[in-house]
Amino acid sequence: MAEGQVLVLDGRGHLLGRLAAIVAKQVLLGRKVVVVRCEGINISGNFYRNKLKYLAFLRKRMNTNPSRGPYHFRAPSRIFWRTVRGMLPHKTKRGQAALERLKVLDGIPPPYDKKKRMVVPAALKVVRLKPTRKFAYLGRLAHEVGWKYQAVTATLEEKRKEKAKMHYRKKKQILRLRKQAEKNVEKKICKFTEVLKTNGLLV
């Protein structure tokens, strides 16, 4: 991958810890990483167990002054960001610089809706978990511990998918019309095509 190029990852269907470990390594190597659809990230283990773990974490606070931390994030993107932070030496200059190269988002807002999104096979749930194993969605966990924007994100995602579907239909129609137009003029331009081919201008 070229230096300065942004790696856009689709978080949906990936396991939280495995994806975080790979992302942490990439940002330390100097690559810019954007993770979209963090609400679709999976966590291994059943939902109830994961919720109990997070509720136990919410009780961790500074007795004398809770505003000093630890801070408990509710948005799926921030929960994922904190997981990655735990895998980086974030109190050093190198770790801070690496963390600045990471961008996390709920849903797929512009301009990332128009960009090619990648997956990480080594972190995919379907590859890593047995089909019978239980798992939870980070979006649902976040919603049940205080994230307020689950419905908003879902609505925006539906709109984006509908828009993408329409764009794909339009693209297919244009390709079909182009093919038909080429077929219509094939006989008329065949002699010119032959000349171009003999001169090596057309392959």
Curated annotation (Swiss-Prot):
Q: Which InterPro entries match?
A: Ribosomal_uL13, Ribosomal_uL13_CS, Ribosomal_uL13_euk/arc, Ribosomal_uL13_sf
Cellular component GO terms held in the UniProt record:
cytoplasm; cytosol; cytosolic large ribosomal subunit; GAIT complex; postsynapse; presynapse; ribonucleoprotein complex; ribosome
Gene Ontology terms describing biological process: cellular response to type II interferon; cytoplasmic translation; homeostatic process; lung morphogenesis; macrophage chemotaxis; negative regulation of formation of translation preinitiation complex; negative regulation of translation; positive regulation of natural killer cell proliferation
Q: Citrulline occurs at which residues?
A: R59, R140
Keyword Cell inner membrane included in the entry's annotation: no
Compartment(s) where it occurs, according to its Swiss-Prot or TrEMBL record: Cytoplasm
PTM summary: Phosphorylation at Ser-77 upon interferon-gamma treatment in macrophages involves a DAPK1-DAPK3 kinase cascade and is causing release from the ribosome, association with the GAIT complex and subsequent involvement in transcript-selective translation inhibition.
Q: Which residues carry this modification: N-acetylalanine?
A: A2
Which residues are modified to N6-acetyllysine?
K191
Q: Which GO terms describe its molecular function?
A: mRNA binding; structural constituent of ribosome
**HAMAP family with a match to the protein in the record:** Ribosomal_uL13
Q: Which PANTHER family match?
A: LARGE RIBOSOMAL SUBUNIT PROTEIN UL13, RIBOSOMAL PROTEIN L13
| Functional note | Associated with ribosomes but is not required for canonical ribosome function and has extra-ribosomal functions. Component of the GAIT (gamma interferon-activated inhibitor of translation) complex which mediates interferon-gamma-induced transcript-selective translation inhibition in inflammation processes. Upon interferon-gamma activation and subsequent phosphorylation dissociates from the ribosome and assembles into the GAIT complex which binds to stem loop-containing GAIT elements in the 3'-UTR of diverse inflammatory mRNAs (such as ceruplasmin) and suppresses their translation.
Protein name per Swiss-Prot or TrEMBL: Large ribosomal subunit protein uL13
Q: Which organism is it from?
A: Mus musculus (Mouse)
Gene behind this protein: Rpl13a
